[in-house]
């Protein structure tokens, strides 16, 4: 009986430790270096995934708000 209780507490503690770890997309994103295309990462999007955060929008994109610091939320022109 005591072994089952200890196993339960161990698994319960491990669950909460794993929950506290950030996901791969969020881990270190604030300190990541941007890619040459001007994007931070695939997971760095804005406007519900319809735009990308860039320093400058491409020719076929228009600025549609701000992401953070000096970055614009760029969306495709329609």
From Swiss-Prot:
A Gene Ontology annotation in the biological process aspect, one of them, is: innate immune response
The keyword Disulfide bond belongs to this UniProt entry's keyword annotation: yes
Q: In which tissues is it expressed?
A: Specifically expressed in testis.
What does the UniProt keyword field contain?
A: Antibiotic, Antimicrobial, Defensin, Disulfide bond, Secreted, Signal
Give the signal peptide range: 1-27
Enumerate the subcellular locations listed in this protein's record, separating them with semicolons.
Answer: Secreted
* InterPro entries from the UniProt entry: Beta_defensin_dom (IPR025933)
Give yes or no: UniProt keyword Signal: yes
Cystine connections: 43-74, 53-67, 57-73
Instruction: Give the source's domain of life in one word.
Output: Eukaryota
Q: Cellular component terms, GO, for this chain's entry?
A: extracellular region
Q: What does this protein do?
A: Has antibacterial activity.
What family does the Swiss-Prot or TrEMBL record give for this protein?
Belongs to the beta-defensin family.
Identify this protein by name.
Beta-defensin 105
Q: Which organism is it from?
A: Homo sapiens (Human)
Report the gene name: DEFB105A
């Amino acid at each position: 009986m005591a072994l089952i209780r200890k196993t339960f507490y161990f698994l319960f503690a491990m669950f909460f430790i794993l929950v506290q770890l950030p996901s791969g997309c969020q881990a270190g994103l604030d300190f990541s270096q941007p890619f040459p295309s001007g994007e931070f990462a695939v997971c760095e999007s804005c406007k519900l995934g319809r735009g990308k955060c860039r320093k400058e929008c491409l020719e076929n994109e228009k600025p549609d708000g701000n992401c953070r610091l000096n970055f614009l939320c760029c969306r495709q022109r329609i």
